[in-house]
Curated annotation (Swiss-Prot):
Keywords: Electron transport, Membrane, Mitochondrion, Mitochondrion inner membrane, NAD, Respiratory chain, Translocase, Transmembrane, Transmembrane helix, Transport, Ubiquinone. This is NADH-ubiquinone oxidoreductase chain 2. InterPro entries: Complex_I_Subunit_2 (IPR050175), NADH_DH_su2_C (IPR010933), NADH_UbQ_OxRdtase_chain2 (IPR003917), ND/Mrp_TM (IPR001750). Disulfide bonds: none annotated. Coiled coil: none annotated. The keyword Translocase applies. It catalyses: a ubiquinone + NADH + 5 H(+)(in) = a ubiquinol + NAD(+) + 4 H(+)(out). It is found in: Mitochondrion inner membrane.
């Protein structure tokens, strides 16, 4: 792709998200979503092949359907309130339809089916954009309309997302699909606490973007997309492989790594709100995610022979990329659990 066109498309994606986050007019918000969606599709098809074409088509159809639902909710709310801007009161029907549309854009269960398929069909760079940046705009609207959202709908979707994010990743061998199911589960954790403490959702979002971005960048350095290729990188880049495995354990929420911090604080918040049964179910279901991450770590690090047969190693040129920002990202993604007391005081 021409660098100038790539820059223009990237700026349009950023501009679309910023319009959504900074607008108080529903029509401008809808236009921002459309700008963002139409600009991100060429980024998904940057590697021009049938898989990326299929992934981009699935993404377009899903997002277009969500945009239609969003416009329907905006029109119903306009008929109810008579104005285009945010109000303290929203028609209950419009609120439910808008929540469902934003859940579809985020990939929350039961509208999650497109996330693993689209993530698997695109490159690692496009997958990074899809699972991090593309979550900001819908989450900002959900954060804004939190007072008028039905909390039962959010809690049902969050519990279902955490369960599906755990079950779906159990039998996967593709690392991109594993991260996609992890994304579904993390979105569920964010939605569970949104109705009780929206600030906690922002903390979880920050930690999720930090850990997912670092993991994707490590995959790019190691040029690995499957569990088999990951297990064969020990001889080539042992430090990078170790970092990937630690990052995955952090994504799974294993203490004392940083991924445990948002889960700990969300469970604490739900317990304060007398949702003890929900907090218990979420903690138990989160073990599914942790299980397949630990299983992947065990299979990669403890069951391989010290020296792999050279015939099994893929040919690869030495990377010339300068990844000077990776060490601080890895440290922030794994060793920030001691910040928990400060977070509790701020909360």
């Amino acid at each position: 792709m021409n660098p100038l066109i790539l820059l223009l498309i990237t700026l349009t994606v950023i501009l679309g998200t910023l319009i959504v986050m900074m607008s108080s007019h529903w029509l401008m918000i809808w236009m921002g979503f459309e700008m963002n969606m139409l600009a991100v599709i060429p980024l998904l098809m940057k590697q021009y092949n049938p898989r990326s074409m299929e992934a981009a088509t699935k993404y377009f159809l899903t997002q277009a359907t969500a945009s239609m639902l969003l416009m329907l909710a905006i029109i119903i709310n306009l008929m109810y309130s008579g104005q285009w801007t945010f109000t303290k009161f929203m028609d209950p029907t419009a609120s439910i339809i808008m929540t469902l549309a934003l859940m579809m854009k985020l990939g929350l269960a039961p509208f999650h089916f497109w996330v693993p398929e689209v993530t698997q069909g695109i490159s690692l760079t496009s997958g990074l954009i899809l699972l991090t940046w593309q979550k900001l705009a819908p989450l900002s609207i959900l954060y804004t309309i939190t007072p008028v959202i039905n909390p039962d709908l959010l809690l049902m979707a969050s519990m279902l997302s955490i369960a599906i994010g755990g079950w779906g990743g159990l039998n996967q061998t593709q690392l991109r699909k594993i991260l996609a199911y992890s994304s579904i589960a993390h979105m569920g954790w964010m939605m569970s606490v949104l109705a009780f403490n929206p600030t906690m959702t922002l903390l979880n979002l920050f930690m999720y973007i930090l850990m997912t971005s670092t993991t994707f960048m490590l995959f790019m350095v190691a040029s690995t997309t499957t569990t088999l290729s990951l297990s064969l990188t020990w001889n080539k880049t042992p430090l990078i492989t170790t970092s990937i495995l630690i990052m995955m354990l952090s994504l799974g929420g294993l203490p004392p790594l940083a991924g445990f911090l948002p889960k700990w604080m969300i469970i604490q918040e739900l317990t304060k709100s007398n949702n003890i049964i929900l907090a218990t179910l979420m903690a138990i279901t989160a073990l599914l995610n942790l299980f397949f991450y630990i299983r992947l770590t065990y299979a990669t690090s403890l069951t391989m022979f010290p020296t792999t047969n050279n015939m099994k190693i893929k040919w690869q040129f030495k990377t010339t990329k300068q990844m000077n920002y990776l060490p601080p990202l890895i440290i922030m993604s794994t060793l920030t659990l001691p910040l928990a007391p400060a977070m509790i005081l701020l909360n």
